[in-house]
Amino acid sequence: MKLKKFYYKKIKSTNDIALKYLKKGIEEGVILADFQTKGKGQRGKKWISFKGNLFMSVFFEVKNRISLEKITQLNCYIVRDCLQKFTSLKIVIKKPNDIYINKQKICGILQETLFQNKKKFIVVGIGLNLVKSPKIKKYPTNYLNKYTSKKIS
């Protein structure tokens, strides 16, 4: 599947833009942004965005009967395996949708669905702390570039 890319310097939320494209009839694509002003996390939480980190959403139609929970698991495995190529430290999944390194959160995945015209679509938002991480009281955070000598941008 070749996805069309949509790039923005600054937007509210990559997931919100992906949902807007779906509602306009664009059924697949990738949204990339340099900065989000209202990034979203699970259960209405805010994703704190810093310039230089990765903010993206992939959206597409789900054509088989796979459960949304399985899709969430698969997305976590894909992101974990991709990030593992950049460091020798073990990267782990903290269910349901967070990626940790050295017991610190570096990535969150937010999945949203849209049912439209008898079709099921999914939006997979990925927020990856590359160069800076927020200070959060409930859990420790960090950023990937701290743990790799490879250039990631």
Regions found by a protein language model. Name each.
Residues 1, 139-142, 146:
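RNase H-like, Mg2+-dependent phosphodiesterase core
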Residues 1-85, 89, 107:
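N-terminal lobe of the biotin/lipoate ligase/transferase fold
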Residues 28, 119-121:
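Conserved catalytic motifs of the protein kinase core domain
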Residues 82-117, 127:
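Acidic (Asp/Glu) carboxylate-rich active-site/surface patches
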Residues 122-131:
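Conserved beta-strand-loop-short alpha-helix elements that form
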Residues 131-140:
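Cytochrome P450 core scaffold surrounding the K-helix E-X-X-R motif
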Residues 146-153:
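Conserved, helical-rich catalytic subdomain that frames metal- and/or nucleotide-binding sites
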